[in-house]
Amino acid sequence: MNRASPAVKTESNPLSTDELRKIDAYWRAANYLSVGQIYLLDNPLLKEPLTVTHIKPRLLGHWGTCPGLSFIYAHLNRIIKKFDLDMFYVCGPGHGGPAMVANTWLEGSYSEFYPRISRDATGMKRLFRQFSFPGGIPSHVAPETAGSINEGGELGYSLSHAFGAAFDNPDLIVACVVGDGEAETGPLAASWHSNKFLNPARDGAVLPILHLNGYKIANPTILARISHEELESLFAGYGYQPYFVEGSDPGPMHQSMAAVLDTAIESIRRIQREARSRGVNSGERQEAVTYPRWPLIILRSPKGWTGPEEVDGKKLEDYWRSHQVPLAELGSKPDHLKQLEDWMRSYKPEELFDENGCLMPELAALAPEGDRRMGANPHANGGLLLKELEMPDFRSYAVDVPVPGTEVREATRETGKFLRDIMKLNLDSSNFRVMGPDETSSNRLDALFDVTARAWVAQQLPEDEHLSPDGRVMEILSEHICQGWLEGYLLTGRHGLFSCYEAFIHIVDSMFNQHAKWLKVSKEIPWRRPIASLNYLLTSHVWRQDHNGFSHQDPGFIDLVVNKKASIIRVYLPPDANTLLYITDKCLRSRNFINVIVAGKQPALQWLDMDAAIRHGSAGIGIWGWASNDQEDEPDVVMACAGDIPTLETLAAVDLLRRHVPELRIRVVNIVDLMTLQPRSEHPDGLSDWDFDTLFTTNKPIIFAYHGYPWLIHRLTYRRTNHPNLHVRGYKEEGTTTTPFDMTVLNDLDRFHLVMDVADRVPKLSSKGAYLKQLMRDKLIDHKRYIRQYGEDMPEIRDWHWPSPGS
């Protein structure tokens, strides 16, 4: 284990002898606490020889990254105090949880959130015991960790979170530690390009710190095994100014880190000062690249630094074996127990903590105070800073629907006008952004460009449109980065919306999972304040991807979403423009949810006027009386639909049934809020059994046309009384490049198949049903012949509309 003698302050050594002694002691204290959390149940100050009874029965956690994380934390504390910075720490190597907990305990913020974990020997014992222990805290930098917005259990998102946090926070610096293992992930690799979207005149700064300790779980890391020149060129090519801090001797490393951080902060301030005095690009188009070279620090230090050099004759420090728990089997290997005690005593806890277990006052004075402490920074508990969006009245954007099924509109285009004016009303507040992977115009939201542009700080050409350093629409062709930016933006107290093609939102399936888990836990932590919901607007959906083909056809994101906690997720399938307006308003006003809205962008028939849309959207489910004819009697069949195209095909099927079997009593039920189908005991939006039975009856056939995979509806309704009579049509992985209507035919969701389903399941149709089915089969044959001859749908399909009253 390396120990440095104090260095003399020179021009290249910014720390005085006393400053170096103190900062090294502070680092040793954090390392001691990190080891204690992994191993100890008792004897926190080692006031007696270590025995097996002091050791946890199950040793969990990760040591390897902790000393580097704590080294960084101690030095960030120094520059926060020196420059009076508003800064917090995003920890990419989330398995370094012990380090982040240790440092927030040392600075005092942890004990303010958890008074039982006091800043003394009793609190230290509890701190150690709770780590990775039943009833305690997780091993990663979870929501329970003060100052965290990035758990880091699943790697790759730290840097996009950091940039999301920095947008529109001009006085904030986000120090983002990126693990060299994490740097190999796709999302992190793309995140380096975020510097082309950060406007130094308006936004805060991100200080990336690449933690190059050389190893993952059992392999070397790529960036640690390329040459210094290649590594420097890589990050210079990304547009950063890299600074290196390299070594293993703590004394010189402290001096080097202090000097580099001083330079980095001065560079950030110079970049911002120049941009804020003259603007970025001066608002003019430039053919030269003009974004600044932000500083980036590459910290090359040993994995498991200051830990045992060897265990059982095998290398440990500066090798992958230090990744997790360096010393195991302490009960059966006394030499391991002795090695652990020697390791912990090497930090000289008697120099760090007084008799009562309190951090020595001269060391405690190194930490910032109040909200300047990174564990107490309000940006890391964004609900503290959350302000309501200024919202126009969505009813002002209503589509006029004098009668159902005759007017044609593009639902997302109408919502784009609403989003445009939300953006306009909140320009001064700078707290609303729209994210998308190069799809804002494609998804018909381009009204936004009436009031803002795409954020862009890189090169501009004369022919470019809607690019500006001041833009508030964020577009990069990486769903991962869009989601990461938005999460960072929301977690620090702002609002936003993510618009994406339905099939390709699957790219962020696991990011959705992680954010849902974060929200679930955050809701259970009293000091975590509610944040704005994460809102997805999924369009260009499965039923209108006939032109792009099978690869673009997948509605399965909904299935993933409904697996998560009912307290977190909401799924909406508005059938038309007015309902979409209502749902969008509702979602943007909500807190601590993940809202998924699936809506069409193509021209489509409109069903509800605004008053009806509000009533229907508010209930989430309801009978469409104007499309039903069972008002005077029990229905013979319930025709249910969820989604814009299933609604269209259901109503077209109802029209056919009413023309060919007018005596049939039909009830049409439309579902906007998918979770109403679950029992109320399972989801707060769910219908009671009584209400569900009232809508769907207890014994009549239900023909359900659903936007996505049909088995999901069976999952949601399996406990309902009438589930045995439920027949669901939806997407069943049939698709290609074809016509819009043929997509529904390939999946048996079209009007003709729905009519045949009714004929098969309503006993009173008897022989008439056979003739009806034959007629529908003939129509399907006509359809196939027509599209293969003409390349488009039949006129009776293209031109169909809901019959006017009396027709």
UniProtKB/Swiss-Prot annotation:
Pfam families named in the record: XFP (PF03894), XFP_C (PF09363), XFP_N (PF09364)
Cofactor(s) annotated in UniProt: thiamine diphosphate
Keyword Protein biosynthesis: no
Domain of life (superkingdom): Bacteria
Keyword Transport found: no
Gene Ontology process terms (BP): carbohydrate metabolic process
GO molecular function terms listed in the Swiss-Prot or TrEMBL record: aldehyde-lyase activity
Keywords: Lyase, Thiamine pyrophosphate
Enzyme Commission number: 4.1.2.-
Matching InterPro entries: Phosphoketolase (IPR023962), THDP-binding (IPR029061), Transketo_C/PFOR_II (IPR009014), Xul5P/Fru6P_PKetolase (IPR005593), Xul5P/Fru6P_PKetolase_C (IPR018969), Xul5P/Fru6P_PKetolase_CS (IPR019790), Xul5P/Fru6P_PKetolase_N (IPR018970), Xul5P/Fru6P_PKetolase_ThDP_BS (IPR019789)
PANTHER family: PHOSPHOKETOLASE-RELATED
HAMAP family membership: Phosphoketolase (MF_01403)
Family membership noted in the UniProt record: Belongs to the XFP family.
Protein name per its UniProtKB record: Probable phosphoketolase
Organism: Nitrosospira multiformis (strain ATCC 25196 / NCIMB 11849 / C 71)
